Amino acid sequence: EHFRPGHVRHQVVVGPKFLYALFNPQDQLHPVSRAFMTFVRDGDLPYRRLIVNDHIVDEAATRLKKQASMRNAASFLTTLDESTVYQFEPISEDVFDAAKATFVEWTDLDASFTDFVVAAHMDELEVDHVLTYDRHYDAFDVTTLPYRNQD
């Protein structure tokens, strides 16, 4: 029982900070994001479905436009449209309501509303891995990737 292999996850949620770094060559984490995606593309990692939702796309596209360039934002949006790996999953009203309730209740967590939406959406989709550089996700019951040293 203890040595039974775990369920292989073929899907992962892609957070806005990971996407920002991936589509902004000037970002210090761009090489890490690119390397991670190369592993995904080459089949070295089990992920075949990269999930994004409305809030993730909004935050990543807006940040790319304002802090990088419109060209980077457009490249991101075009990639989402043309890629067979990225899967857009709109959030339900139940996810929004759950995120809203948790956002209001968890007053000690300095996370964005998007973070709460993503966590609630992951719970609904039964996805427990998220690609992110956002440490706020450590407060939720999810596994963050790429792995990093815990300070």
List where the protein language model places each region.
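Short, well-structured N-terminal submotif of metal-dependent ribonuclease cores
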Residues: 1-52, 65-75
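Short acidic-hydrophobic, aromatic-tinged amphipathic segments that line or gate anion-handling sites
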Residues: 87-91, 145-147
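Short active-site oxyanion
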Residues: 46-49, 85-87, 126-128
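Helix-adjacent hinge/juxtasegments
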Residues: 62-89
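Active-site neighborhoods of divalent-metal-dependent phosphate/nucleic-acid chemistry enzymes
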Residues: 89-128
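A generic structural signal for short hydrophobic patches within well-formed alpha-helices
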Residues: 19, 57, 137-138
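Acidic, PIN/NYN-like endoribonuclease modules and their adjacent C-terminal/linker elements
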Residues: 1-6, 119, 125-151
